Amino acid sequence: MLNRVQILMKTANNYETIEILRNYLRLYIILARNEEGHGILIYDDNIDSIMSMMNITRLEVIGLTTHCTKLRSSPPIPMSRLFMDEIDHESYYSPKTSDYPLIDIIRKRSHEQGDIALALEQYGIENTDSISEINEWLSSKGLACYRFVKFNDYRKQMYRKFSRCTIVDSMIIGHIGHHYIWIKNLETYTRPEIDVLPFDIKYISRDELWVRISSSLDQTHIKTIAVSVYGAITDNGPIPYMISTYPGNTFVNFNSVKNLILNFLDWIKDIMTSTRTIILVGYMSNLFDIPLLTVYWPNNCGWKIYNNTLISSDGARVIWMDAYKFSCGLSLQDYCYHWGSKPESRPFDLIKKSDAKRNSKSLVKESMASLKSLYEAFETQSGALEVLMSPCRMFSFSRIEDMFLTSVINRVSENTGMGMYYPTNDIPSLFIESSICLDYIIVNNQESNKYRIKSVLDIISSKQYPAGRPNYVKNGTKGKLYIALCKVTVPTNDHIPVVYHDDDNTTTFITVLTSVDIETAIRAGYSIVELGALQWDNNIPELKNGLLDSIKMIYDLNAVTTNNLLEQLIENINFNNSSIISLFYTFAISYCRAFIYSIMETIDPVYISQFSYKELYVSSSYKDINESMSQMVKL
C-alpha cells in the first residue's frame, strides 16, 4: 500500500489521481518530507491547503499512519440564537425574540392605553415570563381589566366578560422557547407563519460591535522565539523527540514525550514573567510541529493547545507563527538567504528513533544553527515589512497576503478620510463568514477542462469595498454595498445554480448574500426576498493605485518576495475567517463569482460542468472559445 501511495504522490498533478489519493487519506495520514527534510503530515482536511502551498509531487513519502491527529481547532463559535423579528399587524402583534415576550407585549399595549403607560412610568415592572405574575401586577395597579388571557382559555367562554383583556396566543418554538402573540382582532386573527432566522441583523449593526481597522494594528512588540519540533519514526507512528528554541534551550527526551512537552512548557512559563503573550516562530509548523505535539499533549498540564495558540490556565497566551506563510513559497534556506541570514541545513524529520538517539548531539547542534538563521531572517523581514506596511505588525496576521492587503486597504482608506471597520464580536463575524461560498457548484457531471481566472488581483483591485460602520436596513438600496439575510427561491425552469445550497430537494431556503451576489442571482432567475441587511453608505475607492505603490515599495526591498507574492495574489484570494479584513474578502470573492457567471452566460449550459468563485470546468467537447473565455487560463 505504501508503494501505491508513493506512486500516486509522484503523479498527483491531475484531478483523478488526487481523488484516488483522497480515498487513502480517509483511512491514513501520510508521513512525508520536503527536500530540506522537514516533516509534513498530510490528511484529508489539509491536502488542498498543502497543494496550494507547494508541489506535492516533489515530496518524499516516508510512511502511512493512523497514530496522528489533525490540528485541534479552537472551541467553535456558539451558534447565534435563532431570531424572530417583530411583526405589528392590524390583527396581532408578535414581539421579536426575547426572554420576556409578555413584557414586550405589555409595553406595546401601553402605546395605546395611557393608564398602562402611566403605571409603567411610575412603578416599572420586573421582567417575568409568568402570566400570573403580570396579572398580579396589573391588579395591584388597578388595571385588572387588561389582564392576560390565553387564547385557548378565552375560547372556552371563561373570560368573555373582560372585553379589554389582553388575549395572547401561546406557543413553544424550537431553539427559541416560549413565545406569545397578542391578538388584537379575534375576528381576523389566524396564527401567522413567522420566519425563524439565524441572525438578528439589527443587533449585528450596533456601533460597539465594529471597530476601525487602524486602531487594532499599532501594537507594541512582543517577545519572539524561533522554535522547531523534530519527530522520529517508531512502530506506533511518529513521535516528537526534540524541541529546539532560539534564543533559548533545546529539549531532548527519547523515553517520555510527556516529560519532553512538560519541560518545554515549564521553560515557556518561566520566560513569561514580564509579558502575557509571546510569539513562537516556526517554519511549516502548521504542517508538522503543532499537529505532532497535539497528538501527545498531556492532560491537566495547565495549557490547552488550539490550532496555533497555546493558552494557559491563568490566561497567558503563546502564538505559534508559521514564517513559511510569509515566505511566498520559499524553502527555509532560500527564505533565510533572501532575508540576509546565513542559510543552514536542519535535521531531517521522520528518521528512525534509533538513528536520532545515536546522533542526538550533532542533531542538537544542527538544529540550533538552523534556528538561529531562521530567527535572524524573521527579525529582518518583520522589521522591514512593518516599516513598509505600517501600522501592520507581522504577529497580527497569519499570512503575508492578509498583511499586505490590510496595509493597502488601510492606506487607501486613510488617504480618503474613511476607514474599513471589522466586527469585534463572534456573531457579526459569523454573519460575514456565512456570506462566503468557496464550494464548487456542480452543474453536470462530464469530462471537463479546467479554467481559472487569469488575474484575480486585476478583478478585485478595480472594485469598491465598504467603508465606515454599517447601518441596519430592512432592504438594501440599489447601488450601495450591503450584506443581507435572504429568502431565496430557486427558478422553476432549467437554470445554472449560482447560489450554493446543500439540499437539492429544497426550492426555498434562507442564506446570507452580498449585494453583488444578489445581483448575480437575480440575473440567473432567482427570486430574492431580503429579510434585513447591513448596508454601508460609503465606499473605499478602487485599490489599484494603492496596490501598485505598495508592490513597488516591497519590490525595491526584495524582488523575489514581491514576485512570488504577486503570483499568489493573482491566482488566489482565499478567504481567511480570522482576518480583520474578512469584510474585504467577502466582497472580493463575490466580485470574482460575478465575473465567472458573466463568462458562463456566454456558454451553452450543457457544456458547464462545475464552477467556484475563481474556476470554471467546461466540457472537453466544447470548442467555441470566445472572447470572454480568453480572460481565463486553461490549466
Curated annotation (Swiss-Prot):
Source organism: Vaccinia virus (strain Copenhagen) (VACV)
Task performed by this protein = Plays a role in intracellular enveloped virus (IEV) transport to the cell surface through microtubule transport. Together with protein OPG064, forms a complex that interacts with host KLC2 (kinesin light chain isoform 2) to engage the kinesin-1 complex and thereby promote IEV trafficking.
Mention any one GO cellular component term assigned to this protein in its UniProt record.
host cell endosome
For this UniProt record, the keywords arranged alphabetically read as follows: Early protein, Host endosome, Host-virus interaction, Late protein, Membrane, Microtubular outwards viral transport, Viral release from host cell, Virion, Virulence
Compartments it resides in = Virion membrane; Host endosome
Its subunit composition reads: Interacts with protein OPG164. Interacts with protein OPG064.
Q: Where are the transmembrane segments?
A: none
Please give the record's induction comment.
Expressed in the early phase of the viral replicative cycle.
| Protein name per the record | Protein OPG056
Q: Predominant location of this chain?
A: virion
What is the similarity comment for this entry?
Belongs to the orthopoxvirus OPG056 family.
Q: Name one Pfam family in it.
A: Pox_F12L
What biological processes does GO assign it? microtubule-dependent intracellular transport of viral material towards cell periphery
User: Which superkingdom, per the lineage?
Assistant: Viruses
Per its UniProt record, what InterPro entries does this chain match?
Answer: Poxvirus_F12L, RNaseH-like_sf
